[in-house]
Regions:
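Structural preference for solvent-exposed beta-strand-turn elements
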Residues: 1-150
Length: 150
């Protein structure tokens, strides 16, 4: 896999999906970011077995493929890229990220091992006014757990 992507787009996409990136899990591959370069797009996906978030980003794809990047490390490196354009190249087990004079290489997982949640194509929308949603959250926030053990 080899593609070029705007560093700003990459950081925006990673920020969105990182919300589903688990900090601890019994399955190390779930601590990664699934990436698939196809056509003129890059699909990024994270899940913690209860929540899955995906985003599709525009990219210049030279070689299609998929791999699972190490989540937190990839997130930190992407945020520190110095140039406007980032090039990411992979082989079966490594990822190389280049931007300007910066270059980083890291180990990766095989995409076939990644556990994706089934995606339902049913469309269901609810429109709620912003103030109504804020009020609903304020009235229920007291009941949320402070940590994951409860």
């Amino acid at each position: 896999m080899r593609f070029y992507i705007s560093t700003a787009d990459l950081n925006a996409g990673i920020s969105v999906i990182a919300k589903a990136l688990p900090s601890r899990t019994a399955m190390p591959i779930l601590e990664g970011i699934y990436a698939e370069a196809q056509g003129n797009n890059l699909l990024l996906r994270c899940n913690d077995l209860s929540l899955q978030i995906e985003t599709l980003l525009p990219a210049t794809v030279e070689k299609e493929g998929s791999l699972v990047f190490p989540g937190r490390l990839f997130l930190d490196l992407a945020r520190r890229q110095p140039d406007e354009q980032t090039m990411i190249e992979t082989d079966k087990t490594t990822v190389t990220m280049k931007s300007g004079r910066a270059r980083a290489t890291m180990q990766a997982f095989d995409a076939a091992e990644y556990h994706s949640m089934p995606f339902s194509r049913q469309e269901f929308f609810v429109n709620i006014k912003k103030n109504t949603l804020k009020s609903m959250i304020r009235q229920t926030i007291f009941a949320t757990a402070q940590d994951e053990t409860k």
